């Protein structure tokens, strides 16, 4: 994406214009003020987690205002005719979708992901929990693909099917897999977003299903995704389940699912936060369209 082509010193300079003081910018990034001059001397020393924080702030302050334009329309990115029943084409695509949704949330390397999927054995430097997350994600998305695309069956979006999807994703990871959370959940990377109270989750999810189950355009699916993540019905795995629902709803509508991964991760978080805090979805809709277009080129 556009922000990936800009070097980090330039991003820091532009962000400093926004924050005014280096101490304020350092606090927003999550580092000490001394880190900023150190980075100017050695930009390569910026750790990946802080590169992500810088990218997210850059997207938030510069790209989001640029993308927040009503009245934009996009041609639907349809599922190519060459995809169904062509394993040589759709399997690499599924692997990219699966790794992407894991990469957004964890630091798992592509090598470890491939080893977990291909060998179905635990890599030496990977916890059993992360191993299950990788394997469950890939095979759950593969099941969705085979059900909707190969068998021509619609994935009926309901509370029960969403819970079943969560059980598949989180089996071997959490004891409460497949059940709504009974605790307050916090979204660590999104500011100003409050999740639904535990006692209100069933009612809010019932409302989500009523309003969003039949979403069939990329704009509707993007808005439904932000709404689902704001509810945050499960104790963990909400992002992966939310993106799996995006995939299912896109395939139901014969649309190509958007590809979210490390390349557009910062814009994904910035656009999601903007949609949930301000109720404005134009940047998120554009991101969905650009990510689906990129998936087609992949």
What are these language model-derived features?
Residues 1-236, 240-298:
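FIC/Doc superfamily catalytic core
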């Amino acid at each position: 994406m556009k922000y990936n082509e800009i070097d980090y010193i330039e991003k820091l300079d532009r962000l400093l214009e926004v924050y005014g003081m280096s101490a304020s910018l350092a606090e927003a990034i999550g580092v000490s003020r001394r880190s900023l001059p150190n980075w100017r001397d050695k930009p390569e020393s910026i750790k990946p987690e802080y590169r992500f924080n810088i990218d997210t702030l850059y997207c938030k302050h510069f790209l989001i205002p640029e993308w927040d334009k009503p009245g934009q329309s996009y041609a639907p990115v349809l599922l190519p005719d060459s995809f169904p029943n062509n394993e040589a084409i759709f399997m690499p695509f599924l692997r990219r979708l699966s790794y992407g949704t894991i990469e957004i949330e964890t630091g798992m390397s592509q090598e470890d992901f491939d080893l977990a999927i291909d060998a179905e054995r635990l890599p030496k430097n990977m916890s059993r929990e992360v191993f299950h997350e990788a394997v469950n994600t890939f095979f759950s998305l593969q099941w969705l693909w085979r059900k909707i695309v190969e068998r021509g069956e619609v994935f009926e979006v309901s509370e029960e099917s969403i819970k079943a999807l969560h059980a598949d994703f989180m089996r071997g990871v959490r004891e409460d897999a497949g059940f709504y959370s009974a605790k307050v959940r916090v979204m660590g990377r999104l500011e100003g977003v409050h999740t639904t109270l535990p006692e209100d989750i069933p009612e809010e999810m019932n409302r989500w299903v009523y309003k969003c189950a039949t979403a069939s355009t990329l704009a509707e699916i993007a808005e439904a995704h932000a709404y689902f993540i704001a509810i945050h019905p499960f104790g963990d795995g909400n992002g992966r389940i939310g993106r799996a629902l995006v995939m299912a709803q896109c395939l139901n509508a014969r649309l190509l699912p958007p590809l979210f991964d490390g390349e557009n991760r910062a814009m994904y978080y910035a656009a999601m936060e903007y949609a949930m805090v301000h109720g404005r979805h134009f940047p998120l809709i554009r991101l969905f369209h650009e990510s689906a277009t990129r998936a087609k080129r992949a």
